[in-house]
Amino acid sequence: MKTLLTRSECFSLLIVLACLVPLCIAPSTWAEQAGAELPEAKQTTLGLYLTAREAYSKWQADPDGVTVLDVRTTEEYLYVGHAPMAWNVPLASQTYEWNAEKQHFGFQPNPAFIAQVKEFAGVSDTILVMCRSGGRSAMAVNRLAEAGFSNVYQIIDGFEGDPVKDPESVYNGQRLRNGWKNSGIPWTYQPDPER
């Protein structure tokens, strides 16, 4: 029976351990580590962050104990696509009134947002919140925190992700960098009347 490792086996084991040690002492998610580097508009009072891929893994590990909440407008949810397990409770609705200063259509806040979330989630439940790219979901996390929810994560890259920022690229301005839809994880256009 062989009990000693050869020099080559020892070296290989040392390399493997050197690669694994940083993973053991690192924060639990990349997104948590990057939290301080997030744009202010994507930061939340709870400070709980996940990427879309991390969020999907967290949901897969406990589908009955983790709720995915999509706070985009109903139109975005239906026509751009959505995570199949996501509940849609819009943080706001589109007003279709042009805001010349912001160069965008306006939004009307959803006054029933908290009450609608409480219909399927409790204040201590784990909730993973997404919007298009992380801005509205950060606002939603903060609103939920103010209402007493304590385990609410911000999906920092949202459903569509961040835009490509390369003027030389034909994809400049398109949301192709990250996000649920671009991460190779399940999404659909099919509505679920229960959600």
What are the residue ranges of the model-derived segments?
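Rhodanese-like catalytic fold shared by cysteine-dependent sulfurtransferases
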Residues: 2, 27-64, 78-126, 137-195
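Bacterial N-terminal signal peptides that target proteins for export
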Residues: 2-15
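Compositionally biased non-globular segments, especially hydrophobic aliphatic-rich helices
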Residues: 6-9, 21, 29
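Bacterial N-terminal signal peptides
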Residues: 12-25
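Short hydrophobic beta-strand that contains or immediately precedes a catalytic carboxylate
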Residues: 67-72
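Short, surface-exposed ligand- or partner-binding patches at beta-edge/loop junctions that are enriched
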Residues: 129-131
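Conserved G/P- and acidic residue-centered "switch" motifs that form tight phosphate/ATP-binding loops
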Residues: 134
